[in-house]
Amino acid sequence: MYTFVVRDENSSVYAEVSRLLLATGHWKRLRRDNPRFNLMLGERNRLPFGRLGHEPGLMQLVNYYRGADKLCRKASLVKLIKTSPELAESCTWFPESYVIYPTNLKTPVAPAQNGIHPPIHSSRTDEREFFLTSYNKKKEDGEGNVWIAKSSAGAKGEGILISSEATELLDFIDNQGQVHVIQKYLERPLLLEPGHRKFDIRSWVLVDHQYNIYLYREGVLRTASEPYHTDNFQDKTCHLTNHCIQKEYSKNYGKYEEGNEMFFEEFNQYLTSALNITLESSILLQIKHIIRSCLLSVEPAISTRHLPYQSFQLFGFDFMVDEDLKVWLIEVNGAPACAQKLYAELCQGIVDIAIASVFPPPDAEQQQQQPPPAAFIKL
């Protein structure tokens, strides 16, 4: 009998994983403070990593990688892409971005002496001078000059401003209490018809204890309810596809898709009929490349291969597609929620791939090693 503890009662994904484990009859749930467990389904931000792997004779597995915030916080992701040897020169799939600290945090400002591609040496270096250099050059060249400011730890569409005025963006950040990222706004996105609407794409990615990377075959488009336009960047419902913003502010929420969600099968049909292309050939190949590039760049820093405990983690990668069908990474979520209709399959995959590979069912010795569930693709 294996044992597990649950330290995050708010995760709907791990509530389902917990239910699936108990249903096998091979797992027993312990009190959250019991130190002698096989599996910890923990909270993302306060996991006691230092206490893991010290129980004699007990293999321990936890559902997060220590240090994964290098990918999952917006400012850290920008720094990673600019400083990682694997990404710095070859990354063409991430919008031009700058890390900006509010002036009240008294963070050193990096002088813009190396053009617009700053080498970030300090963990807290403000890049506003580099941003202004790039902004002014685009203005002189007559290029599109719309940017989006996003709180590094923000979620659900909070802490966001879209503007073509540099002073407005910087003033907005300076009145906040935390680091932000200023990122080039994708002004010509691929739009859905009917409705001339924006969308983004959420893909779920599972990394197991051996750092094998699995992409969940199903994904979801989170769609806007209102027609896209560039006349008013304060109109959240046409620019931001966050579920909570669409539901709260748009009278057309649910008009085109139930819950403003379109799944991959329907999206593939749309691409085939409207553009004579397939999802796999035009978009998914790019998504797979970006996911592998990101996760492999942080592997040396977060892998648990030589530690006394093991980790796995579910990630949510968010993408946008421009009118030229180029895929752009927007952000990575380290504790993603899941569309309701996908819970059962996604969570069963977590059990089969990430947990049963470390703690096999008692009858597994009589069975040959099973391939990953068909719902997941090993990258």
UniProtKB/Swiss-Prot annotation:
One of its GO terms (molecular function) is tubulin-tyrosine ligase activity. Keywords: ATP-binding, Ligase, Magnesium, Nucleotide-binding, Potassium. Its cofactor is Mg(2+); K(+). Pfam families: TTL (PF03133). Its EC number is 6.3.2.25. GO terms for biological process: microtubule cytoskeleton organization; protein modification process. Residues 3-370 form the TTL domain. It catalyses: C-terminal L-alpha-aminoacyl-L-glutamyl-L-glutamyl-[tubulin] + L-tyrosine + ATP = C-terminal L-alpha-aminoacyl-L-glutamyl-L-glutamyl-L-tyrosyl-[tubulin] + ADP + phosphate + H(+). The keyword Magnesium applies. It is an enzyme of class 6 (ligase). Monomer. Belongs to the tubulin--tyrosine ligase family. This is Tubulin--tyrosine ligase. It comes from Sus scrofa (Pig).
